[in-house]
């Protein structure tokens, strides 16, 4: 009897080992927190200038956690899934949407030869700008001057990622509105049609990428705001020179013109052109120094703004790092871009919410130092 029990235990363990070899699920995450100082903030009434200290989560990178899994189906085919949600390390609360998996929730099939097809919620394709931003679209970066447009996540997505062939790969997305209106979602919904295509070429010396994408207004299906519902054209390049990485990019946000939401004004900006450049110096295996300049120009009297920033990271281990960033944004007389990716509109307290945009023509300056751990 004892021998039978032993053989049964061995058989069960062997079966578990085979199942483990065929499929896997990985828990991963990142916690980011630090102390931030910012000057040039508006008063509650939108005038004047003030400053503050605060603990902040996500300045260097979004705090997040997730699950991803793969099942080997044989013949080079795999079933894959990913679930990912954001949260605040400072408060423990969920991301801004309040959803558990507000960043990613998808499932699909992958093939070593033919690529990967996914269905579900995903990072909008414009997040591909990240690879060409010296500060990785952190809080004070290219995202600030397009007011967070390139941080978007889209639901009801169908995407395809090709394998890399001779240095080239392509990626495409199509997000359904899930409505009888082809472009717009149901009334009150947060989903309009989205789509985009991306082509990348990579070798040991350089990398280049081009992206075209659309984000439609969920209420009317129009392209009616350069920062929330527009077409974007992007081209970026990375140059790898030993310990140095040189990065540069250009984006153009375009609407269909007419009345721009949410301002309701025919004279609000209908275009935004942004360019940036920067250098990362890998001083040691653990320490990196970064410097970058970002500039945006809008039409219809919306003005222009420039962010100057330096920073760096020091890796205490493969999973833990210290980070620091110093930045300032300079606005022309009619522009009011902040260091953070704030919504459009005047700064100050409006409808119970505080908008950090400075007074038009004023600047903001900030310093951030924090710690980040990945698992």
Please give the residue ranges for each predicted region:
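Gram-negative outer-membrane beta-barrel proteins
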Residues: 35-43, 87-93, 125-127, 178-182, ...
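Extracellular loop and loop/strand-boundary signature of outer-membrane beta-barrel proteins
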Residues: 49-53, 93, 143-146, 182-185, ...
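Outer-envelope beta-barrel architecture signal
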Residues: 23-29, 71, 75-79, 113-117, ...
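Gram-negative bacterial Sec-dependent N-terminal signal peptides
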Residues: 1-22
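Outer-membrane beta-barrel "beta-signal"
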Residues: 316, 359-375
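Detector for outer-membrane/organellar transmembrane beta-barrel domains
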Residues: 190, 195-314, 325-327
